[in-house]
Amino acid sequence: MSDLPLLPISSASTIASCASLPLCISDVFICSYPKSGTTWTQNIVHKLLSNGVKNLEHISESAPFFEVDTHWTGEATLSPSVVAGHARANGGRRVFNTHLLWSMLPRARHAARYIYVVRSGSDVAFSFFKHLSSQRGDGGWDIDTQGGWDVFFTAWLSGEIPYGKWAAHVEHWMSAVDAEQRCGI
């Protein structure tokens, strides 16, 4: 699945940086197919790491979207805003939110932990439709030019939307070999 369709906010150079980021043993990746409960899980992880103290304006300060171009300044170098957010929100511990596949993420033996969140496919499909429909012009789903729910659902089933087929994404993650570093929710 190396040809995974992505949002326009993720360039090939950013995806390469994502894969080559040097890991720390304390890194946490909150992973999912879009609209599967990532934000909910980000909040839980932040509460655990901060002992319940909410010291941020938005959860993305604690767990930024990993594959966004603006979060990188060069090859495998996180932007100063991401580094500052981690320092402020997590005491320097790095937490990321991502929809990339297991095979696209940095890995090293005994380094980092990966939480994979799964939600019912039917719930995900409708939630993703509503989410992308609200982002017309930003890589979202334009109902006026692309069609409504029926057209979106067909594209979702065939994997012609960002992050591809839901079932293939889940299967890819569930078949990952390094299970000791991965927790499914």
Where are these regions (language model features)?
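PAPS-dependent sulfotransferase catalytic domain
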Residues: M1-G184
